[in-house]
Amino acid sequence: MSRYRGPRLRVTRRLGELPGLTRKASKKSNPPGQHGQARRKRSEYAIRLEEKQKLRFNYGVSEKQLVRYVKKARAQEGSTGTNLLRLLENRLDNVCFRLGFGGTIPGSRQLVNHGHVTVNGKVLDIAGYQCKSGDVIGIKENKASKKLVEGNIEFPGLANVPPHLDLDKPKLTGKITGKCDREWVALEINELLVVEYYSRKV
């Protein structure tokens, strides 16, 4: 399953608010599809699937990528669910989003893919790069790159930069100072249900 490129509001109507995917909110309260039908009680599988889809669409990863992250999270010490969220939060495109360099994760991914972002002083165009403590994320030294980011950083997608990121707004740089705490994940998600979803699949 590839990365989603369809209407974003259609997804948020079905799954709820996804701050990484879009800043817009749907004016329609009903989920997409036919209406007026009696709502059936959802199965446990359907609930787990929905939580998994929230992660996929919010962070903009493919099913194949998410499976790899789940395997990696399992291999690490500690809670698999927390490890999974941290792996997704540490993606370069997401770090750029949390710093305010891009208004959404897709917007931040475009900045990375087009060579506007640096890691430790070198241009890096790999959106899925796993940022680590001590990494300094910056913007390429040219007018076009800086102009793109300066417009975004004045109106960031999320109001607050999490405490594990140290933003130097005038210099357009951010340093990773530690691990992302669970409470600072900007998505309403039950990560344990995601882990359960993959328990028999991975």
Swiss-Prot record:
The keyword Ribonucleoprotein applies. Disulfide bonds: none annotated. Transmembrane segments: none annotated. Keywords: Ribonucleoprotein, Ribosomal protein, RNA-binding, rRNA-binding. One of its GO terms (cellular component) is small ribosomal subunit. SMART domains: Ribosomal_S4, S4. It comes from the Bacteria. GO terms for biological process: ribosomal small subunit biogenesis; translation. One of its GO terms (molecular function) is rRNA binding. Residues 1-13 have a biased composition (Basic residues). Residues 90-152 form the S4 RNA-binding domain. Residues 1-42 are annotated as: Disordered. Part of the 30S ribosomal subunit. Contacts protein S5. The interaction surface between S4 and S5 is involved in control of translational fidelity. Belongs to the universal ribosomal protein uS4 family. HAMAP family: Ribosomal_uS4_B (MF_01306_B). One of the primary rRNA binding proteins, it binds directly to 16S rRNA where it nucleates assembly of the body of the 30S subunit. This is Small ribosomal subunit protein uS4. The lineage of its organism: Bacteria, Bacillati, Cyanobacteriota, Cyanophyceae, Synechococcales. The gene is rpsD.
